[in-house]
C-alpha cells in the first residue's frame, strides 16, 4: 500500500472577504471590517478528520422551556413544492433518442459556425448561440474565432465596421477576456467628443448594441460611461414613441424593452435562454436547426436539473428539516436549488448543484433562527456551539435549535470528508470557521435589533456583506468546481483578495435589500442598506434605492476587471462568483424571490426546472 500525504488548509483567524477595493470607497473608504474570531485551533491529521455523525437527542435541554417567551413570527407559508411532487418529476429528456439527435444537431451547428470566416454573420451567430443558451457547447470554437478577430484589430486588419458590428464585436471580445480598448468607439464621436447625433436617426440596432456593450465598462472607462448614458436616454425615448404609436411595435421594440429592463450582461443564462427561445421562434428569419437544438438542449438540461433536485429533496426529507418541524423558518429547498442552476447550469456540475443547494437551504434556516425566532441568549448559545464544533454542545441548545445544529454539523463534516477524498485536503477547520464567522455576523445583527441600534451604512455593510452568506457558497463552490487546487488560490480565497468573490457577495447583499425591504420591515428587522443611507444622508426612500442601484453598477465595474480567463482560480469558479451576482438580480428583481411564493417565483421555477419547452 502506498502512503498518501495529506495537505492541510489551515484557516486564518477570520475570512476577510471584503478587502480594500475601489468599490469600498463608495461606501466608507478603505477601512475593512473583520469580525472577532473564536479561539479555535487547527489540528493536523493524517487520518479522516473529526467527521463523526452525531445523534440528535430528544431530551430537553435546560434552556428548552420556551413557554413564557414571546417570539416574533414571519408567518412564512409552507412550501408549494412537496416532496412527492419533486420525486414525481419525469426527467423525460434523457438517453436515447434525445442524445443522438442532440449530437447530430450539435455537429450541424458547429459546421455552420466554423464555416463563416471572419464575417459579421459569424459574430451574429455567436450572439444568437449565447442567447439561445447553447454557446457552451462551442466554447473552444468561439474562443478560437474571437482570437482571430482580436488579432486583426491589434494589427489594424479589421474591416471598417458600422456601429452595430463594432459594438457587437466589442461585447463578445470583452466577454471572452480579450482586452479590446474602449477607444474603438471614438470613430462614432463628433469633433466635440460626443457621440454623433446622426447615429440616433436611423440606427436603433446599433444604439442597442452599443448599450449592451457599455455594461462591460471597467473603472476609469469614460467612453463607455458616456455610451451608457447616451444609449439609455435614446432607447427610453424610443420606447416612449412606441407607446405613443409613433413607431411600430416590432421585434426590435421587444428587444429594446427587454434590454432596458436589465442588460444582457447582468442576466442569468438559463432564464435568458428560455425567454429568447420563445422570442426567436416568432421571428421570420429564424434558423430551424438552431431552434430545434436550443429547445432540445434546454429540455435535456432540465431533466438533469430534475434529477439533481430529486437527490437534494431526498437529503432534505431524510434530515427531517422538510417535515414542517421548522415552522418558524423558510422551507425553500426548491428556491435554494434554483439559485444553483443559475450559478452553474452545465451538465457536468451536478455535484456542485447538489452540494450548494444543501448549503443554501441550511443558510436560510439558520438565518431565520437569528432574524426572527431566537432570543438573544439562545442565539449566543447557538453561536458558541458552532464555534466549538463539538457534538456534545447540542445538549446545551433549546430543542428547536437541535435539529438545525445536528444537520449542519453532519453536513459540513460529510462535505469535508468528500473534499479530503477528492483533493487530499483537510478542510473541516476552514469550513466550520466559515460557519462560525457567519453566525457571529448574524449575532451582531441580532444585538442591533434587540438594542434598537441603527448602524451607519458603513457599519451595516461591514457586517451585512458577510452575513448574506456568499462567502460560504464560494468556499463550497471552490472545492466543487476546482480540479487542481493550488496554495496560491487557497490563500487568496482565504484572505478575501479575489474581486469576484467580494463583489459577488456584496451584490447579493444589496440586491437582497432592494427586494426584501418591505417584508422585513413589516415583521421587524435591523435597518437595511436603504434605511441606513436614508438615516445617514436624509435622503428619501426612492433616492436611497437609486443610490443602492448605483452601487450595484459600480460593483459590476469591479467584476468586469476580473479576467476569468487569466486568473489564479479556475474559469469555472470565477464564472460562478459572477453568476451569483447575476442570480441575485434575477431572484430579487420583482421582490423577495427566495422567500415569497408569488406568481413571479412560481413562474421562474416552472420555466427553468419543471416544464419543458414543447418540441
Curated annotation (Swiss-Prot):
Catalyzed reactions: (2E)-geranyl diphosphate = (1R,5R)-alpha-pinene + diphosphate; (2E)-geranyl diphosphate = (1R,5R)-beta-pinene + diphosphate; (2E)-geranyl diphosphate = (4S)-limonene + diphosphate; (2E)-geranyl diphosphate = beta-myrcene + diphosphate
One function term, GO molecular function aspect: myrcene synthase activity
Temperature dependency: Optimum temperature is 30 degrees Celsius.
GO cellular component, one term: chloroplast
Pathway recorded for this protein: Secondary metabolite biosynthesis; terpenoid biosynthesis; Terpene metabolism; (-)-alpha-pinene biosynthesis; (-)-alpha-pinene from geranyl diphosphate: step 1/1
Broad enzyme group: lyase
InterPro entries referenced in this protein's UniProt entry, alphabetically: Isoprenoid_synthase_dom_sf (IPR008949), Terpene_cyclase-like_1_C (IPR034741), Terpene_cyclase_plant_C1 (IPR044814), Terpene_synth_N (IPR001906), Terpene_synth_N_sf (IPR036965), Terpene_synthase-like (IPR050148), Terpene_synthase_metal-bd (IPR005630), Terpenoid_cyclase/PrenylTrfase (IPR008930)
Cellular location(s): Plastid, Chloroplast
Keywords on record: Chloroplast, Lyase, Magnesium, Metal-binding, Plastid, Transit peptide
Cofactors demanded by this protein: Mg(2+); Mn(2+); K(+)
Residues holding Mg(2+) 3: 512, 516, 520
Pfam families: Terpene_synth, Terpene_synth_C
UniProt transit peptide range: 1-55
Sequence positions that bind Mg(2+) 1: 367, 371
Free-text comment about domains: The Asp-Asp-Xaa-Xaa-Asp/Glu (DDXXD/E) motif is important for the catalytic activity, presumably through binding to Mg(2+).
Family of this protein: Belongs to the terpene synthase family. Tpsb subfamily.
Role this protein plays: Involved in monoterpene (C10) olefins biosynthesis, constituants of cannabinoids and terpenoids-rich resins. Catalyzes mainly the conversion of (2E)-geranyl diphosphate to (+)-alpha-pinene, and also produces minor products such as (-)-limonene, (+)-beta-pinene and beta-myrcene.
Full protein name: (+)-alpha-pinene synthase TPS2, chloroplastic
Protein source organism: Cannabis sativa (Hemp)
Higher taxonomy: Eukaryota, Viridiplantae, Streptophyta, Embryophyta, Tracheophyta
Amino acid at each position: 500500500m502506498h502512503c498518501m500525504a495529506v495537505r492541510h488548509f489551515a484557516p486564518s483567524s477570520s475570512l476577510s472577504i471584503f478587502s480594500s477595493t475601489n468599490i469600498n470607497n463608495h461606501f466608507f473608504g478603505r477601512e475593512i471590517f473583520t469580525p472577532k474570531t473564536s479561539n479555535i485551533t487547527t489540528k493536523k491529521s493524517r487520518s479522516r478528520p473529526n467527521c463523526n455523525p452525531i445523534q440528535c437527542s430528544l431530551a430537553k435541554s435546560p434552556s428548552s422551556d420556551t413557554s413564557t417567551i414571546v417570539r416574533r413570527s414571519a408567518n412564512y407559508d409552507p412550501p408549494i413544492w412537496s416532496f412527492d411532487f419533486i420525486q414525481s418529476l419525469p426527467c423525460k429528456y434523457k438517453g436515447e433518442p434525445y442524445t443522438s439527435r442532440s449530437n447530430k444537431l450539435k455537429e450541424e451547428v458547429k459546421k455552420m459556425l466554423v464555416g463563416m470566416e471572419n464575417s459579421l454573420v459569424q459574430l451574429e451567430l455567436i450572439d444568437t448561440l449565447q442567447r439561445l443558451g447553447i454557446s457552451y457547447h462551442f466554447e473552444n470554437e468561439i474562443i478560437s474565432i474571437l482570437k482571430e478577430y482580436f488579432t486583426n484589430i491589434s494589427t489594424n486588419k479589421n474591416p471598417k465596421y458600422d456601429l452595430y458590428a463594432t459594438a457587437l464585436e466589442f461585447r463578445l471580445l470583452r466577454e471572452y477576456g480579450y482586452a479590446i480598448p474602449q477607444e474603438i468607439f471614438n470613430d462614432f464621436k463628433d469633433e466635440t467628443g460626443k457621440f454623433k447625433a446622426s447615429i440616433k436617426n436611423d440606427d436603433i440596432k446599433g444604439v442597442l448594441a452599443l448599450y449592451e456593450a457599455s455594461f462591460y465598462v471597467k473603472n476609469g472607462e469614460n467612453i463607455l460611461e458616456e455610451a451608457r448614458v447616451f444609449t439609455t436616454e435614446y432607447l427610453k425615448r424610443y420606447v416612449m414613441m412606441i407607446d405613443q404609436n409613433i413607431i411600430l411595435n416590432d421585434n426590435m421594440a421587444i428587444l429594446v424593452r427587454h434590454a432596458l429592463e436589465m442588460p444582457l450582461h447582468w442576466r442569468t443564462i438559463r432564464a435568458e435562454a428560455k425567454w429568447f427561445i420563445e422570442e426567436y421562434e416568432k421571428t421570420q428569419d429564424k434558423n430551424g436547426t438552431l431552434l430545434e437544438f436550443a429547445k432540445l438542449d434546454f429540455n435535456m438540461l432540465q431533466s438533469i436539473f430534475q434529477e439533481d433536485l430529486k437527490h437534494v429533496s431526498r437529503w432534505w426529507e431524510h434530515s427531517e428539516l422538510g417535515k414542517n418541524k421548522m415552522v418558524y423558518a423558510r422551507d425553500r429547498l426548491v428556491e435554494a436549488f434554483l439559485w444553483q442552476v443559475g450559478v452553474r447550469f452545465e451538465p457536468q456540475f451536478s455535484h456542485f448543484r447538489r452540494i450548494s443547494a444543501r448549503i443554501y437551504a441550511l443558510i436560510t434556516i439558520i438565518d431565520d433562527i437569528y432574524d426572527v425566532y431566537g432570543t438573544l441568549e439562545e442565539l449566543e448559545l447557538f453561536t458558541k456551539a458552532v464555534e466549538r464544533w463539538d457534538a456534545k454542545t447540542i445538549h446545551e441548545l433549546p430543542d428547536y435549535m437541535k435539529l438545525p445544529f445536528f444537520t449542519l454539523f453532519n453536513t459540513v463534516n460529510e462535505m469535508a470528508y468528500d473534499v479530503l477524498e477528492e483533493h487530499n485536503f483537510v478542510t473541516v477547520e476552514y469550513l466550520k470557521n466559515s460557519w462560525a464567522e457567519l453566525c457571529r455576523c448574524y449575532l451582531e445583527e441580532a444585538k442591533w435589533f434587540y438594542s434598537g441600534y441603527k448602524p451607519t451604512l458603513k457599519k451595516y455593510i461591514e457586517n451585512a456583506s458577510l452575513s448574506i452568506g456568499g462567502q460560504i457558497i464560494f468556499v463550497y463552490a471552490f472545492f466543487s468546481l476546482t480540479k487542481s487546487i493550488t496554495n496560491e488560490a487557497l490563500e487568496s480565497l482565504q484572505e478575501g483578495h479575489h474581486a469576484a468573490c467580494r463583489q459577488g457577495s456584496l451584490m447579493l447583499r444589496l440586491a437582497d435589500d432592494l427586494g426584501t425591504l418591505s417584508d422585513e420591515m413589516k415583521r421587524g428587522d435591523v435597518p437595511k442598506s436603504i434605511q441606513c443611507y436614508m438615516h445617514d444622508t436624509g435622503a428619501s426612500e426612492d433616492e436611497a434605492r437609486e443610490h443602492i442601484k448605483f452601487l450595484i453598477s459600480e460593483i459590476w465595474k469591479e467584476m468586469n476587471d476580473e479576467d476569468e480567463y487569466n486568473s489564479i482560480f479556475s474559469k469555472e469558479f470565477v464564472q460562478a462568483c459572477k453568476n451569483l451576482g447575476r442570480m441575485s438580480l434575477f431572484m430579487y428583481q420583482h421582490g423577495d424571490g427566495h422567500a415569497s411564493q408569488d406568481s413571479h417565483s412560481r413562474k421562474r421555477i416552472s420555466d427553468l426546472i419543471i416544464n419543458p419547452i414543447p418540441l
